[in-house]
Amino acid sequence: LEKYAVLKVSEEQYQAVDKRYLLKEKKEFFGVACLTNEKQYYIENYPEIVVESGSLDQVILMLTGGER
Protein backbone atom coordinates (compact mmCIF):
# COMPACT_ATOMS: atom_id res chain seq x y z
CA LEU A 1 0.00 0.00 0.00
CA GLU A 2 2.94 2.37 0.61
CA LYS A 3 3.76 2.29 -3.13
CA TYR A 4 0.31 3.65 -4.01
CA ALA A 5 -0.39 7.36 -4.29
CA VAL A 6 -2.96 9.76 -5.66
CA LEU A 7 -1.51 12.44 -7.92
CA LYS A 8 -3.46 15.68 -8.07
CA VAL A 9 -2.66 17.51 -11.27
CA SER A 10 -4.07 20.31 -13.39
CA GLU A 11 -5.23 19.55 -16.94
CA GLU A 12 -1.97 21.07 -18.19
CA GLN A 13 0.17 18.93 -15.87
CA TYR A 14 -1.85 15.85 -16.82
CA GLN A 15 -0.98 16.34 -20.48
CA ALA A 16 2.75 16.51 -19.64
CA VAL A 17 3.00 13.72 -17.05
CA ASP A 18 4.23 10.22 -17.95
CA LYS A 19 1.08 8.07 -17.93
CA ARG A 20 2.95 4.75 -18.04
CA TYR A 21 2.43 4.09 -14.31
CA LEU A 22 -1.08 5.50 -13.93
CA LEU A 23 -3.65 2.88 -13.01
CA LYS A 24 -6.77 5.07 -13.02
CA GLU A 25 -7.69 8.68 -13.69
CA LYS A 26 -10.67 10.65 -12.42
CA LYS A 27 -11.79 14.17 -13.34
CA GLU A 28 -12.01 16.47 -10.32
CA PHE A 29 -12.81 20.16 -9.82
CA PHE A 30 -9.08 21.03 -9.66
CA GLY A 31 -8.11 18.93 -12.69
CA VAL A 32 -7.37 15.20 -12.60
CA ALA A 33 -6.74 12.75 -9.77
CA CYS A 34 -4.57 9.82 -10.84
CA LEU A 35 -3.89 6.58 -9.00
CA THR A 36 -0.41 5.11 -9.30
CA ASN A 37 1.48 2.25 -7.71
CA GLU A 38 4.80 3.98 -8.45
CA LYS A 39 4.68 6.85 -5.95
CA GLN A 40 8.46 7.30 -5.75
CA TYR A 41 8.77 7.66 -9.54
CA TYR A 42 6.43 10.66 -9.55
CA ILE A 43 8.00 12.22 -6.44
CA GLU A 44 11.46 12.07 -8.04
CA ASN A 45 10.53 13.05 -11.59
CA TYR A 46 7.68 15.54 -11.04
CA PRO A 47 8.44 17.60 -7.91
CA GLU A 48 5.87 20.23 -8.94
CA ILE A 49 2.83 17.94 -8.65
CA VAL A 50 0.90 17.01 -5.51
CA VAL A 51 1.52 13.38 -4.51
CA GLU A 52 -0.65 12.10 -1.67
CA SER A 53 0.00 8.74 -0.06
CA GLY A 54 -2.82 6.41 -1.00
CA SER A 55 -4.98 5.28 1.88
CA LEU A 56 -6.83 2.01 1.50
CA ASP A 57 -10.10 3.92 1.05
CA GLN A 58 -8.63 6.16 -1.66
CA VAL A 59 -7.16 3.22 -3.55
CA ILE A 60 -10.45 1.30 -3.48
CA LEU A 61 -12.47 4.36 -4.54
CA MET A 62 -10.13 5.10 -7.42
CA LEU A 63 -9.99 1.49 -8.58
CA THR A 64 -13.78 1.17 -8.60
CA GLY A 65 -14.66 4.63 -9.89
CA GLY A 66 -11.80 5.92 -11.95
CA GLU A 67 -11.46 5.89 -15.72
CA ARG A 68 -8.97 3.91 -17.80
Range-by-range predicted roles:
Residues 30-68:
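C-terminal coupling/interaction segments
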